[in-house]
């Protein structure tokens, strides 16, 4: 049996696929932020490209600076930089494109019917373009030595790196699903929550795999620098982890009602039960 809410969601998705988007008050949120007005696809693609560009430029750039200038940034500084730039770009472009910046996130949103499939290849193309341009910019700006490679390669075995990428990608998408697609969450804090998750993930998995969580983050530097060692890890790992994170959260989310509505209903039922018990005792 199909619920009324599911019927409404299917209708909204059909409108989006036809280009008839609805705003955040009456429509479906497709990612980190929702826009109050219709935004043409070209603007969304430009926002995705610019957002991905500055994420790669800042995150990978700080890695290069740290190596070339004697470790002045330090590992904690690198972790914080990645989280901050993701947070900044979410708040800067989320209301335009949804702030995916990640092919695996885009595909997962589409799989769970929160993003139109026809836009998926266009979004992925914009994300890869942003990553390639940022990587090319860094190569032109700095004398990038093999030691200062700003891509991602497994530190030890590919198996260890794969496990690390799956776990941290799972956590990333689990958080994104919670703060971006659940109407009960506080959407204004989405950027902070996702940024903090990035910081934690880089702290934990950075020494093992480089903490990519994003095929675009790894493919751009690999293509520009011509280094493809273990690149499959950074395609398979994020896709598996992000899909699993989205699946688990969607499995857990049993209702779309805000918490205040659930608590009101619970209070009402308790009052009815108390009155019923009181009437029985009087009788």
UniProtKB/Swiss-Prot annotation:
It comes from Arabidopsis thaliana. Residues 1-23 are annotated as: Disordered. The chain crosses the membrane at residues 51-71, 77-97, 120-140, 161-181, 189-209, 231-251. It holds the Pfam family MIP. The gene is NIP4-2. A motif (NPA 2) lies at residues 214-216. It is a multi-pass membrane protein. The modification Phosphoserine is found at residue 267. One of its GO terms (cellular component) is membrane. One of its GO terms (molecular function) is channel activity. Aquaporins contain two tandem repeats each containing three membrane-spanning domains and a pore-forming loop with the signature motif Asn-Pro-Ala (NPA). It is found in: Membrane. A motif (NPA 1) lies at residues 102-104. InterPro entries: Aquaporin-like, Aquaporin_transptr, MIP, MIP_CS. The modification N-acetylmethionine is found at residue 1. The lineage of its organism: Eukaryota, Viridiplantae, Streptophyta, Embryophyta, Tracheophyta. Residues 1-21 have a biased composition (Basic and acidic residues). Keywords: Acetylation, Membrane, Phosphoprotein, Repeat, Transmembrane, Transmembrane helix, Transport. Its main location: membrane. Disulfide bonds: none annotated. This is Probable aquaporin NIP4-2. Aquaporins facilitate the transport of water and small neutral solutes across cell membranes. Belongs to the MIP/aquaporin (TC 1.A.8) family. NIP (TC 1.A.8.12) subfamily.
């Amino acid at each position: 049996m199909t619920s009324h809410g599911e019927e409404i969601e299917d209708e909204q998705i059909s409108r989006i696929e036809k280009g008839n988007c609805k705003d955040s008050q009456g429509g479906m949120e497709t990612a980190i932020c929702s826009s109050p007005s219709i935004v043409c696809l070209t603007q969304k693609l430009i926002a995705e490209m610019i957002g991905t560009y500055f994420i790669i430029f800042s995150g990978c750039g700080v890695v290069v600076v740290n190596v070339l200038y004697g470790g002045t940034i330090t590992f904690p500084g690198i972790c914080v930089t990645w989280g901050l730039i993701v947070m900044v770009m979410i708040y800067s472009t989320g209301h335009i494109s949804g702030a995916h910046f990640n092919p695996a996130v885009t595909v997962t949103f589409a799989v769970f019917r929160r993003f139109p499939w026809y836009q998926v290849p266009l979004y992925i193309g914009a994300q890869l373009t942003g990553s390639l341009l940022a990587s090319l910019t860094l190569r032109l700006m700095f004398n990038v030595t093999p030691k200062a490679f700003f891509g991602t390669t497994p530190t030890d075995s590919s198996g260890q790196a794969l496990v690390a990428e799956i776990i941290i990608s799972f956590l990333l998408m689990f958080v994104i699903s919670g703060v971006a697609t659940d109407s009960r969450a506080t959407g204004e804090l989405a950027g902070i929550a996702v940024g903090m998750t990035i910081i934690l993930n880089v702290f934990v998995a950075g020494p093992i795999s480089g903490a990519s969580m994003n095929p675009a983050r790894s493919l751009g530097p690999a293509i520009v620098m011509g280094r493809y060692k273990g690149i499959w890890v950074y395609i398979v790992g994020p896709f598996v982890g992000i899909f699993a994170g989205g699946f688990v959260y969607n499995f857990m989310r049993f209702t779309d009602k805000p918490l205040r509505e659930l608590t009101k209903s619970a209070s009402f039922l308790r009052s009815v039960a108390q009155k019923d018990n009181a009437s029985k005792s009087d009788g």
